């Protein structure tokens, strides 16, 4: 299938490489011409993914119009750019094209809503949105380290299309979920627990304290998630 990946940061490049590995026709977009020129010339991003070579088969462009012909559009832009990028996409992609957001967090510019809500609002609700989220590091995905992730959406068809695009039999397992609220909130709230776990380490409190903090933190995430509509 044709996949258009918006964003050439570490995560965007890693996912573009995975999709290319899976046999898809992949285009990566950046809004910076100098970055586009550098990636064309060097075929790598030494700052974010040192030693990782971007395959020649991945097209790199500053022209977003190619998204109009894509079966799947992947949003891998910084969180502050999600809304503005989705607004541009709304003028380009046809209705029903699946939009996959791979960022985590909440949209502080729009009342701390979930990013799937931000995208859906920007695109007038005409496109199914998938949250692709999980315990993942870009550099490990780029190097083919075994990884598991979840594609969550209110649209089962959109989640399964995303699963089919990203999953392979060697190193990338994709599960599907209808609980997009829970998946997005979990991806955002876990950062708070991660900070607390780091503080525990810094204070030298040991494994017992950190384990207790993480366990109770997971319980709080689940309780708060349910209050906010998660399953």
Indicate residue ranges for each PLM-predicted region.
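Internal alpha-helical scaffold of NAD(P)-dependent oxidoreductase catalytic cores
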Residues: 81, 92, 122-128, 146-231
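Rossmann-like NAD(P)(H) cofactor-binding subdomain of soluble oxidoreductases
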Residues: 54, 65-146, 162-164
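Short, conserved active-site loop motifs that form the nucleotide-linked donor/cofactor pocket
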Residues: 57-59, 172
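Hydrophobic/aromatic beta-strand patches that form the interior of the parallel beta-sheet core
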Residues: 27-29, 61, 74, 100, ...
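NAD(P)+-binding Rossmann beta1-loop-alpha1 motif at the extreme N-terminus of oxidoreductases
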Residues: 1-52, 61-62, 113
């Amino acid at each position: 299938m044709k996949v258009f990946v918006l964003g050439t940061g570490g995560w965007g490049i890693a996912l573009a490489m995975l999709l290319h590995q899976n046999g898809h026709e992949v285009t990566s977009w950046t809004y910076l011409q100098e970055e586009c020129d550098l990636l064309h010339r060097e075929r790598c991003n030494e700052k974010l993914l040192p030693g990782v070579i971007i395959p020649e088969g991945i097209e790199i462009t500053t022209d977003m119009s190619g998204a109009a012909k894509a079966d799947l559009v992947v949003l891998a832009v910084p969180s502050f750019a999600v809304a503005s990028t989705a607004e541009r996409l709304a003028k380009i992609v046809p209705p029903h094209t699946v939009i996959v957001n791979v960022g985590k967090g909440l949209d502080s510019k729009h009342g701390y809503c979930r990013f799937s809500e931000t995208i859906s609002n920007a695109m007038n609700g005409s496109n199914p949105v998938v949250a692709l989220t999980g315990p993942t590091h870009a550099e490990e995905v780029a190097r083919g380290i075994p990884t598991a992730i979840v594609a969550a959406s209110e649209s089962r068809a959109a989640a399964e299309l995303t699963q089919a695009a990203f999953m392979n039999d060697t190193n990338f397992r994709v599960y599907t979920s209808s609980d997009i609220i829970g998946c997005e909130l979990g991806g955002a709230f876990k950062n708070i627990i991660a900070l607390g776990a780091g503080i525990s380490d810094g204070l030298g409190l040991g494994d017992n304290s950190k384990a207790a903090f993480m366990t109770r933190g997971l319980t709080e995430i689940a309780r708060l998630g349910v209050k906010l509509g998660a399953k």
